Amino acid sequence: MLVHAAERPPASDRRRPHAILRAIVIPYFELPSLHLGPFTLQAFGLFAALGVYAAARIAAREASRRGLDPRPLSDFALWGVASGVVFGHLVHLFLYHPEELSDWRRALSFWEGLSSFGGLLGGVVAAVVFFRRRTIRFANYADALALGVAPGWGIARVGCFVIHDHPGVRTSFPLAVEFPASAARTLGFSGARHDLGLYDALALFSFAVVLLVLDRRGLLRGRLLAILALMYGTSRFLFDFLRASDVPYADARYLGLTPAQYFCFGLWAYGAWQLKKKEEA
């Protein structure tokens, strides 16, 4: 059926819903650095430190609730952070931005360029070494670790959000960040875009609530870390399809997937294996 021009809504009316959505996106902002004498603390570093502290404190508290000695988790925190930074930087260099390997100074600058999954890999390696050397059964502490890691990682991801480190594709979604036109000169892109740091943080905080509810109701005991692996692996795999490829510092892709998406297969395998092992026990 033909629609006459007189029956069509005015162009301004047709554009109004889109304009409303654009009006409610998150405005671009930057948090200033914190200067402490000769030291400068960047916003990301502050949230990363808070995340590590929160994860360690919550995990230790949960271990105590279970009648376990919390000191191994407090001692492990330093191991986990050190190994996480090293592996996080190496994964960033070798998988995300291998072009930077041509400059040996970048390879040694461990504080510049970190992959969250590389950090996770470093934490896993540190956990294997630490718990074996201490002859402590890791499974006893797995639930406590899950309850600490989820909110702690979420806080660290807020650090990614406040520096807008992971821009996504353009969108009019209400949780998008509106990068101003002036950002094109400094960042190389502008417009309303998904911000994957925010999405990751919201997902992890949600997972923390789910795990806490399961724990307090006595459900899936001994399986919370596996549940976290399955939930985060799924959310991260889906979120990474929203990552921008039209920005100057875009993540590398391999057969259409980011390195993190391949790591998600490892999380799924670990989660499924742990759940199956618990069922057979």
Per-region residue spans from a language model:
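A feature for loop-to-transmembrane-helix boundaries and adjacent hydrophobic helices
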Residues: 20-281
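Short linear/disordered segments characteristic of secreted peptide precursors
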Residues: 8-10
